[in-house]
Regions:
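Intrinsically disordered, low-complexity, hydrophilic segments
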Residues: 1-192
Length: 192
């Protein structure tokens, strides 16, 4: 099974992709989303954040934008803080967080087939307010899924890496503090 991973600058872009994937018959069980907690506060009624800063577990959340996101969990990931986590990849990430030596989000992305340099960019993009979307698929659906995911302008990891490097960034640092909503918005404005 192939895994497609994209990061969007806004939750709305990712949500549109999820809706189109579901409309195309992609099972919700094969779709996963990870976004900063502040995004969840805009789109879901977050009722509890019980995960620790080391990524030890899931909290609870109620509501959600896209249908499959109802009942999403909150997961604390080093360098990202609390994130909204829904779907199969979130479960993979919980396992990676429990065995901290596996590398957290970067390790989970690499294990799912993402090149390590791109995994660093994707992790940094989520830290800065982006939304990560992963989809599992068989070969028969690959072209369709790729088209849907690219429809809503996901980031280009090579371009984004160059933008980040212009500010002195080299790779994702799990010890770095997560961006606040205002920092994330300023970062988006700077890149426009």
């Amino acid at each position: 099974m192939a895994v497609y991973t994209k990061v969007y600058d806004s939750y709305a872009q990712a949500e549109s992709s999820v809706r189109d994937l579901e409309a195309a018959g992609i099972p919700s069980a094969d779709i996963s989303l990870i976004a900063n907690k502040y995004v969840s506060e805009q789109y879901a009624d977050v009722s509890d954040v019980s995960a620790t800063s080391t990524g030890a577990g899931l909290g609870t959340a109620v509501g959600g934008g896209a249908g499959f996101l109802a009942g999403v969990g909150l997961l604390a990931i080093p360098g990202l803080g609390p994130v909204v986590a829904a779907g199969w990849f979130a479960a993979t990430l919980v396992g990676a967080a429990a065995g901290a030596a596996t590398g957290g989000l970067i390790g989970a992305l690499v294990d799912a087939g993402t090149a390590e340099p791109d995994a660093h960019v994707y992790s940094e993009a989520v830290r800065r307010g982006g939304t990560l979307l992963t989809v599992r698929t068989n070969a028969a659906s690959a072209v369709q899924i790729d088209g849907i995911l690219n429809r809503y302008q996901p980031i280009d990891p090579a371009v984004r890496r160059r933008e980040y490097e212009q500010t002195g960034w080299r790779e994702f640092d799990p010890a770095a503090k997560p961006y606040t909503p205002s920092q994330a918005e300023l970062d988006r404005i700077r890149r426009r």
